Amino acid sequence: MAYSFTEKKRIRKSFGKRQDVLEVPYLLATQVDSYRRFLQLDKQPAARSDEGLHAALKSVFPIKSHSGNIVLEYVSYRLGDPVFDVKECQQRGTTYAAPLRVLVRLVVYDKDAPVGAKVVRDIKEQEIYMGEIPLMTDNGTFVINGTERVIVSQLHRSPGVFFDHDRGKTHSSGKLLFNARIIPYRGSWLDFEFDHKDCVYVRIDRRRKLPATVLLRALGYDNEQIIAEFFDTNRFLLSSAGIQLELIPERLRGDIASFDIRLGDQIVVEKDHRITARHIRMLQKENVNLLDVPKDYLYGKILAHNVVDTSTGELIAKVNQEITEDVYARLVAAAIPEIRTLYVNDLDRGPYISNTMRIDLTETQLDALVEIYRMMRPGEPPTKEAAQTLFENLFFSAERYDLSAVGRMKFNRRLGRTDPTGPGVLENDDIIAVLKELINIRNGGGTVDDIDHLGNRRVRSVGEMVENQFRLGLVRVERAVKERLSLPDADGLMPQEIINAKPVAASIKEFFGSSQLSQFMDQNNPLSEVTHKRRVSALGPGGLARERAGFEVRDVHTTHYGRVCPIETPEGPNIGLINSLAVYSRTNEYGFLETPYRKVIDGRVTDQIEYLSAIEEGQYYIAQASASVDENGMLKDELVSCRHKDEFTLASRENINYMDVSSKQIVSVAASLIPFLEHDDANRALMGSNMQRQAVPTLRTEKPLVGTGMERIVARDSGVAVVAKRGGTVEFVDASRIVVRVNDEETEAGVPGVDIYNLTKYTRSNQNTCINQRPLVKPGDVVARNDVLADGPSTDMGELALGQNLLVAFMPWNGYNFEDSILISERVVQDDRFTTIHIEEKTCVARDTKLGPEEITADIPNVGEAALSKLDESGIVYIGAEVKAGDILVGKVTPKGETQLTPEEKLLRAIFGEKASDVKDTSLRVPSGMDGTVIDVQVFTRDGVKKDERARQIEEAEIERVRKDLNDQLRIIEKDFYQRAEQMVLGKVADMGPGGLKRGATITREYLDSIKPAQWLEIRLQDEDVNLQIEAIAEQIAQQREEIAKRLEEKRRKITMGDDLAPGVLKMVKVYLAVKRRIQPGDKMAGRHGNKGVISRIVPVEDMPYSADGTPVDIVLNPLGVPSRMNVGQVLETHLGWAAKGVGLKIGRMLEAKAKIEEIRSFLTQVYNVSGRQEDIASLSDAEVLELAGNLQDGVPMATPVFDGATEEDIKAMLRLADLPESGQATLFDGRTGDVFDRPVTVGYMYMLKLNHLVDDKMHARSTGPYSLVTQQPLGGKAQFGGQRFGEMEVWALEAYGAAYTLQEMLTVKSDDVNGRTKMYKNIVDGDHRMEAAMPESFNVLIKEIRSLGINIELEQD
């Protein structure tokens, strides 16, 4: 197998037994593909499909004037180039977006044309600016106002029709009341529901309910048509001899005979007996078609049609009328030969529509329309036209109602139609079909839907949400445009003057800036970025509300298998509402989640992959990835464990249709990074998945010794590492960039054969962690496409590395690991294992105030020299300065209002002039509890404001850096072109050339060295083809020079132009501080199995327990943390980690002993190829084997894929190979006494993470600070520099101890006794430590509260 550049330097030994048939797909595909489909930038305007921006514009245009004489049509759109690139946007705090220009056509028709003929009078086309559309970066994020944001996908209920019941909760009888709901993509909801009396009602948009027949009548159906649609009928023949029923024997089954049923003289069924299947067979056998029935049998039956006396035209009985003696007498009197009645029974043919029609008071279509109008617009007087229009617009107008393709597909599929397509609006048949299905379900003939089934929930991704937002903006524009087109002079206007695009821009801006689903990207580490982009949320607009979501919605559903991770979800109020996509999951064209399966044909597993959605999956038998398969791909077992219709079951192998593609198919990316996940309890695995996302990138990254094989994939797809775009040779490397000369076969004509990768150095992330990239390649290295060239934060040689491998012992140690506390060795701190760098951004803004402009300056009143020593002449701190709490970063003075001056100040003013006291110091200082090093300063100046010296220096340095970059780029490109030219001319026959080259001479290396490379292009050969190629090269070089000059000019313009600052801001200075945080007691650490704890103590190395060979352990964990938590994975990880380290040390000893290369090769083969996946060690050269062995000295990295990992036997074999005890336990000695501990201790290497819950960020101290305005009590919380609350229960504690003076101090001078605390401060300054407590402000507040109730209460002073 082929290894990538970094892979072969450190191959990870995998214990996986099964080959993955399918590569893990690109992890950010959901986001990237969705937005690509929205913009369709890669397609020509004519070829664009009906989705995204194009669909939104098409749905709103053409816009017609009210008269229809002027039409504004949409032609096409294009996106311009963004003004700034991603990095510039982040620095300047702007949005990374491109201008949208829409080509529209204004068509004016002739008003005076004859009726019916349309004569075009004028056509104008114009491109209109429609605001900025934010662009997605390569990694699936958006830069909005300078910060990276992610639009989280939403899991919402799919449009379509849903049938449900109330679970017996509505009525006290507990009767199930069924309902149907038609949910469109946009438009009014239509609900049908039963009440406890079995009448059917309709609601529109959840308003007041009306009988369902009102809606049918409004659709134009009369009573007879309604009855005919919903009921079968029985036919009765009436004559003077009696009544005969046209018999359909099947309809009698189960009824109790109300009269004797006879065949000739024989009684088949006696009166009051039940009619059974045997009786029906007898009747069918005798071919009985007509049955004599007594007239009592007819009474109570319901007429299915209007009965009219043909001779007189008189209406005898109405449709849906019950037949009584009176009605029967009238029928006989009029000699009606036959009637039809409704066929109903209590079992499966309920009379629901008939009952509903009785409570319906409307008679005609107009009555029904008016009734609906009254319900929708209560209080407005209805007119015929208004009622008609309102009803039309509700469900039948494409502008107001859209089921969407998904909705129509779900609708048709649910109603059993074969064609998944159809109109976006409702039709009469649709409404009738829904009612019929609802009645069928009430009759017991159908089932209700499960709304938590993933076939009924779909994913709405970025592209779709932005499209909806864009459409909303366009609809607002449409209203304004219609108004304008109706103005008298509209036909003389240009499209630009008619369309005001502000609403569109505003709605897009609002969505990206403040939507619930537009979130500040979680940028702690690469995993948290990837997970954030793969998140699906059920919350947000059009989704669920957190408070109203019940248990069912949050629960794991069988259809989540392979689509949504059952493990990774937040703890707390959002549990189950926010989920993560499974590793292989993707969305289909309709937005439903699909997961891949291998096709199984006649018990044989093929490599054919098919993606199935939850709807399609139900009908198949699907085997697990762990099903045993022989070498020919046949399933071995006769009975295979599989899934079918939401159940786990056993099926014979011939019945199996599909098989899972991978054992990690059911989990998300974060969960798939937990080794031995199969041995952890789900609750702890959930914590493990969530805590990996909080790991802070360490200063020195270290790959996990025990991983799962997913680490490389996550690091690659996260975008934090630099990946080669094209293969080639590394030409130049330094800390900030890598230059690759591209292979000839990968270069395209006109594209430079050089790739330059600028690395990100010490940049701040959203979470204040440090983003830094380090090159992995050396000049001369040959790299292929997609190889990792540089590591980013938390990556080590292209693998995700969130923490550090520590030598752990599971044992108690003096109670310091009580309750999950963690004891660590001082060695961990010394070696900077968990040292992290955090970058803080501090901003100072100079505004224009009413009293005059604020000024950034080093001339600050009443500040000593020492405080200004780190500032330059512009008043801004130097880069590299080490600052501590209280130091000035940026000096700033603000004009002070004219106050009443004291005589002394007047004197000073008279002597020293104005400046002394009319400004106050408002400098930016380092906040308390923070110290660090200034690593960067940026100055932003408003257009028209003079730039200070520092701003100019920064600008010049930036321009110089860009110039150097571009010149290097040009030099490398030229060198590349010259080398290609040299290869073309060497050894060829010359025609003419510089430097006295004779015609017919062969061109040699000496000749080429004697002239400048630029002159090589002047050589003319006798081979005309080569001459043309050389001319092309000369042309390309000229073109590149021109382009680079243009780019330099463009960059210079951007750097020197004024900045677009907020209104009233003259200048803004940003200072970046790098803060180094070592690990210390109070910091939170965790493993990957949900085993978290807080550091209780750091112990000197000499006091730590040590092993027989003198190695002290790094960290001591409490063994009681394992059994009750049921996360045994951590113990297995510890064993395997020890083995991995042991094998690495063994390789190290071999290298030290200068072992032969064959020896090393055979040992590596033993390590890699005895169990698990086979590695191709033989394909590596000797040098590569030595480099690999060198990289393995500190441990052989191992992978145990989830649900397919190392067995106990595998671990023991590895421990044996490393010459370590198979028990995984060792005898330890107490570092303080040297005594042996009583029992052997489990020792090994565990991967530990430092989480972003650092004690430095949580703890602070206050002496005096801000107070609340009303109560005058100190504020609370670190952000407000608040105090500690001494609450009710704490007061009880002091009361219990009788500590009266302490209590008095707490409640007065330390809290809200305003005079007392001022006096106390003064006393302490004077060295007098007495206190006088006065009355706390709380009493005054209480008095005021009581007075507000109208009770006058006064305190009497003694």
Swiss-Prot record:
Gene3D superfamilies: 2.40.50.100, 2.40.50.150, 3.90.1100.10, 6.10.140.1670, DNA-directed RNA polymerase, beta subunit, external 1 domain, DNA-directed RNA polymerase, subunit 2, domain 6, RNA polymerase alpha subunit dimerisation domain, RNA polymerase Rpb2, domain 2. One of its GO terms (molecular function) is DNA binding. It catalyses: RNA(n) + a ribonucleoside 5'-triphosphate = RNA(n+1) + diphosphate. One of its GO terms (biological process) is DNA-templated transcription. The keyword Cell membrane does not apply. It is an enzyme of class 2 (transferase). Its EC number is 2.7.7.6. The RNAP catalytic core consists of 2 alpha, 1 beta, 1 beta' and 1 omega subunit. When a sigma factor is associated with the core the holoenzyme is formed, which can initiate transcription. Pfam families: RNA_pol_Rpb2_1 (PF04563), RNA_pol_Rpb2_2 (PF04561), RNA_pol_Rpb2_3 (PF04565), RNA_pol_Rpb2_45 (PF10385), RNA_pol_Rpb2_6 (PF00562), RNA_pol_Rpb2_7 (PF04560). This is DNA-directed RNA polymerase subunit beta. DNA-dependent RNA polymerase catalyzes the transcription of DNA into RNA using the four ribonucleoside triphosphates as substrates.
